[in-house]
């Protein structure tokens, strides 16, 4: 400890507004030639380095679907029941798929009314286009197919078996290794909209639909799993019940789990990562852990088995950890320190929080982050959860921190432990606010990626990896920051 009256030599912490990237000679002739692909974790690759934050006002299934279609990924928040979070995972997986593992099924003895209810299933926008008719929901032996058009002139009491197209007249396949191109060719030559894939006993295994093939072939940027489904992540905590949550999420189809607590450099987080990596129910997916702010934390989580790191203690727009607990590290320095350790082990890093502009994304990635996690910038979009409110004559949506008062009270109420002690004991490290309604998410992502492409080009690079090797920073004064924005005009 320093002697009384003297100050120790303190390290300096920098954030995004303290620096700029120095422009360098560029061989890039077009921004379109810049490669923005990266890794989220050891085994998950993305087309763009943007991750939707696991906040209940930012990322549920709608946000996650758009994120994956645009080349990124969404992390589903955990401030809901296990069943609700798993249902969101399944919705993302069904939104765009080559092989549908659980097609909607119905029995031959069902009525028209029951069939209509199944066709209008709420798990997919607009319902489903057809139902697979099976003899039994357990054995799943295919009997036929029922479409909406089959019901057009049917009476209310008509049975499915009298309305369906029998299996003898259907195009089916037993080739469970069929490729996307092969399926498209079968549909073209046989003029069919659906191909059920059957097992040796005629049991229904998968379903391929024309609409899903068109979605896949029409979007080359989407991040997909090995079965052609959109990828999605899910957040968990470190409590006893989170072991059950983790196993259920993996079973539902989550591609990655994010152990997400405010102070990730803790025995609770480290022990959770270790447990997930040895549990056969969860160790088949990558595990990301955080949040952290130091090189020591990065090393400890990597030693525990983490496949990715989430960096950021207190930089978020709705986070007040640094004010309440006096703890944190300015974000640019955090990213640099953690990434330096992570790179040695081949573990990707997520820069979580403090991103206000596309330029900040460029700085975070140049500093060593492989991806950035966005909350505020994606809140208020059409896909973001929450109702549209009107404030001062303008449409807004709510954004709130997951360590804030409202989120924790909602959690306590859901867990049926809401009493007077909860109100007295809670020390919030997050706040609630509103953001303007911003419209669809996809155009916002395109603008951010366009800025990143420019930033990579200014660094004289063609890719993220190249940028991280070549990037050079310059510190700037407050006057330099003011000069960086628009000035000396009246904005329109």
UniProtKB/Swiss-Prot annotation:
Record text on activity regulation: Activated by GTP and inhibited by ATP and IMP. Mycophenolic acid (MPA) is a competitive inhibitor of the enzyme with respect to NADPH.
UniProt-annotated catalytic positions: 319 (thioimidate intermediate), 321 (proton donor/acceptor)
Pfam families: CBS (PF00571), IMPDH (PF00478)
EC number, UniProt record: 1.7.1.7
Binding site residues for GMP: 352-354, 375-376, 401-403
Gene3D superfamilies, per database record: Aldolase class I
Name of this chain's protein: GMP reductase
Organism: Leishmania major
Gene name tied to this protein: GMPR
């Amino acid at each position: 400890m320093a002697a009384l009256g003297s100050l120790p030599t303190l390290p300096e912490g920098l954030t995004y507004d303290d620096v700029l990237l120095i422009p360098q000679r560029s061989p890039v002739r077009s921004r379109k030639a810049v490669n923005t692909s990266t890794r989220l974790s050891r085994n998950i690759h993305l087309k763009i380095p943007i991750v939707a934050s696991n906040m209940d006002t930012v990322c549920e299934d709608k946000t996650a679907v758009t994120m994956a279609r645009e080349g990124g990924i969404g992390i589903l928040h955990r401030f809901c029941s296990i069943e609700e979070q798993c249902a969101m995972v399944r919705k993302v997986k069904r939104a765009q798929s080559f092989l549908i593992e659980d097609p909607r099924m119905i029995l031959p003895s069902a009525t028209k009314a029951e069939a209509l209810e199944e066709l209008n299933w709420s798990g997919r926008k607009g319902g489903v286009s057809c139902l697979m008719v099976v003899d039994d929901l357990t054995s799943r032996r295919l009997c036929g197919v029922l479409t909406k058009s089959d019901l057009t002139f049917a009476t209310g009491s008509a049975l499915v078996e009298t309305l369906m197209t029998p299996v003898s007249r259907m195009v089916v396949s037993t080739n469970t290794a069929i490729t996307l191109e092969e399926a498209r060719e079968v549909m073209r030559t046989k003029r069919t909209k659906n191909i059920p894939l059957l097992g040796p006993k005629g049991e229904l295994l998968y379903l391929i639909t024309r609409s899903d093939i068109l979605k896949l072939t029409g979007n080359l940027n989407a991040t997909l799993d090995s079965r052609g489904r959109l990828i999605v992540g899910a957040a968990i905590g470190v409590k006893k019940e989170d072991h059950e949550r983790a196993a259920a999420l993996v079973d539902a189809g989550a591609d990655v789990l994010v152990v997400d607590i405010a102070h990730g450099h803790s025995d609770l987080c480290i022990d959770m990562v270790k447990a997930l990596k040895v549990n056969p129910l969860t160790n088949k997916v990558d595990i990301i852990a955080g949040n952290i702010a130091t090189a020591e934390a990065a090393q400890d989580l990597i030693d525990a088995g983490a496949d990715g790191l989430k960096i950021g203690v207190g930089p978020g727009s709705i986070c007040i950890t640094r004010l309440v607990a006096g703890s944190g590290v300015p974000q640019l320095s955090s990213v640099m320190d953690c990434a330096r350790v992570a790179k040695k082990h081949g573990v990707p890093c997520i820069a979580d929080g403090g991103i206000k502009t596309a330029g900040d994304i460029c700085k975070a990635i140049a500093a060593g982050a492989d991806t950035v996690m966005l909350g505020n910038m994606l809140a208020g979009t059409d896909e973001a959860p929450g109702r549209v409110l009107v404030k001062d004559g303008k449409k807004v949506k709510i954004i709130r921190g997951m360590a804030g008062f409202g989120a924790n009270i909602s959690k306590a109420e859901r867990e049926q432990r809401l009493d007077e002690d909860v109100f007295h004991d809670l020390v919030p490290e997050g706040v609630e606010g509103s953001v303007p309604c911003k419209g669809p998410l996809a155009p916002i992502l395109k603008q951010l990626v366009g800025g990143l492409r420019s930033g990579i080009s200014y660094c004289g690079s063609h890719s993220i990896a190249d940028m991280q090797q070549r990037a050079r920073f310059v510190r700037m004064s407050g006057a330099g920051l003011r000069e960086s924005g628009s000035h000396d005009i009246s904005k329109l």
